[in-house]
Each structure stands twice: as structure tokens, then as C-alpha cells.
Swiss-Prot record:
Recorded name of the encoding gene: petL
Protein name in the entry: Cytochrome b6-f complex subunit 6
Entry's Gene Ontology BP terms: photosynthesis
Subunit structure, as described in the record: The 4 large subunits of the cytochrome b6-f complex are cytochrome b6, subunit IV (17 kDa polypeptide, PetD), cytochrome f and the Rieske protein, while the 4 small subunits are PetG, PetL, PetM and PetN. The complex functions as a dimer.
Subcellular location field: Plastid, Chloroplast thylakoid membrane
Keyword terms of this UniProt record: Chloroplast, Electron transport, Membrane, Photosynthesis, Plastid, Thylakoid, Transmembrane, Transmembrane helix, Transport
Disulfide bridge positions per record: none
Amino acid sequence: MVTLISYISLLAGFVIIASVFYLALVKIKLI
């Protein structure tokens, strides 16, 4: 149970980092 929660939180953090990096890349391309 604890490992599942930690895995989900890790996956969520990875998704957030990936989305932020994607938005930054799009802004660089627009400029």
C-alpha cells in the first residue's frame, strides 16, 4: 500500500516536471 502511494506520487511528480519542461520548450520556440 505504501509502495503504491509512493509510486503514484513519484509518477505525478514526473508528469508535473515533464509538463513544465514542455511548456518552457514551447515558450523558447515561440520566442
